[in-house]
Amino acid sequence: MLTGRLPQQGRTQPGSTNQNYLFHLDNLSVEYGSICALKSVQLTIYPGEILFLTGPSGAGKTSLLNVLGGYLEPTSGKAILPHQRSTKHFVSTVFQDLRLLNKKTCEDNMWMAYDSSLYGNKNEYFREMEDLSRLLGVYDHLNRKIDDCNGGLKQKVAMIRALLSKPTALLADEPTSSLDKENSYRLFEVLNHFNHKKGLTIIWATHNKELIKQFPGKIAHLDQGRLVYSGHACFI
């Protein structure tokens, strides 16, 4: 829980934005009928940042991720997204609906991200898939059908597929909800490596305060649709 008086210098103020951003939300609101899911959100996310979205259930984290992913249009305000700034930018998502093919194997689902323009050949892609599968403990299950996998294994498959697409940014909504502590940390260690070595921007909605404390990053804390704090995670 966020406690005490939060400093305001971490907040993004209108008109003060460095133009080298990936995402920029300007006074953005989202309404579902009479329900206001996001209220006047002002947020800028820069390349290579790790941003944890925090807040109680119903605070607007999923709605914010859907806006950032281009799946949800704001009711008012403006959202500038990576693909609008450069065709080189690509955003991968791992949301609660993992969009896996249940009758296909783990490996089949990972092949869905293959793009010949990103890899020299299929062998290169498979080696990357193999490496990530070993790191996350999925390798021995590559031939298992998704229908026969538990929730944690499904989340890992979805994450590997997302990383194989070589995204500029990764949006994740509680992607460790079915994983134990050890596997959660292992997953984020892999993501942290991608952040440091490849400049991957990570935006991660989570209730896991211990995970946030273990990895460097910023937080954007939402409450009742309002962004009440954006800045360093030392106020967790």
Please report, for each region that a protein language model flagged, where it lies by residue:
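The feature captures the beta-strand-to-loop junction immediately N-terminal to the Walker
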Residues: 54-56
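Helix-to-loop junction immediately C-terminal to a conserved catalytic motif
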Residues: 69
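Q-loop/switch helix immediately C-terminal to the Walker
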Residues: 104-116
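Conserved ABC ATPase "signature" region
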Residues: 123-141
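Conserved ABC ATPase signature
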Residues: 145-153
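Hydrophobic anchor residue at the start of the ABC signature
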Residues: 159
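Catalytic Walker B motif of ABC-type/P-loop ATPase nucleotide-binding domains
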Residues: 170-173
